[in-house]
């Protein structure tokens, strides 16, 4: 379905969770650090005192660097990214003390190149939280109503939410965005 939607378009960086279906859609992938922090906290709560606590600290450091990107030079960001990669290598050499920590470390070894892409790509966020917040109303609607009775209803609802979310990004109310779209003047995201 995603391939049908994107067609030949391939984003430079795809921000995603660690789900296999989220791999390969962009030239590069940035994993959501918020999800990884949650996974690390689960490992800590399950008793890991080896890998997970240090991994949490490393992710928080990366997020802090990311928040400072506007004031840092590209060369400085590249140095920070290389430093984060070196620290990750050292962390991956630490033996986790609980099964949840071992599982987390195995998963991170498989996707280690996807953790710090955002450091050197200024327009890439460290998390996909904004996207998930945009999906939340649809998820709530589906849970409350039990879903849609027709494909037409689902498409219409998705289109309306898309117009509203795009309008919000451009400082318009839901009503303004819908009125403009229905009048044939939709807000277009620049190519």
Regions from the language model: what does each represent?
Residues 1-191:
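Catalytic center-proximal scaffold of phosphoryl-transfer enzymes
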């Amino acid at each position: 379905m995603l391939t049908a939607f994107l067609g030949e378009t391939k984003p430079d960086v795809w921000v995603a969770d660690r789900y296999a279906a989220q791999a390969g859609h962009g030239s590069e992938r940035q994993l959501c650090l918020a999800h990884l922090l949650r996974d690390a906290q689960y490992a800590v709560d399950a008793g890991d005192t080896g890998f997970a606590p240090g991994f949490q600290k490393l992710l928080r450091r990366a997020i802090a660097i990311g928040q400072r990107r506007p004031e840092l030079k590209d060369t400085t960001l590249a140095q920070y990214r290389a430093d984060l990669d070196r620290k990750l290598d050292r962390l991956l050499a630490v033996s986790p003390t609980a099964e949840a920590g071992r599982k987390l470390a195995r998963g991170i070894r498989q996707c280690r190149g996807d953790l710090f892409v955002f450091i050197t790509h200024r327009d890439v966020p460290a998390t996909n939280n904004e996207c998930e917040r945009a999906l939340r109303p649809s998820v709530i609607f589906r849970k409350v109503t039990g879903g849609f009775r027709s494909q037409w209803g689902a498409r219409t609802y998705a289109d309306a939410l898309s117009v509203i979310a795009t309008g919000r990004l451009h400082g318009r109310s839901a009503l303004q965005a819908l009125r403009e779209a229905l009048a044939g003047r939709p807000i277009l995201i620049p190519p």
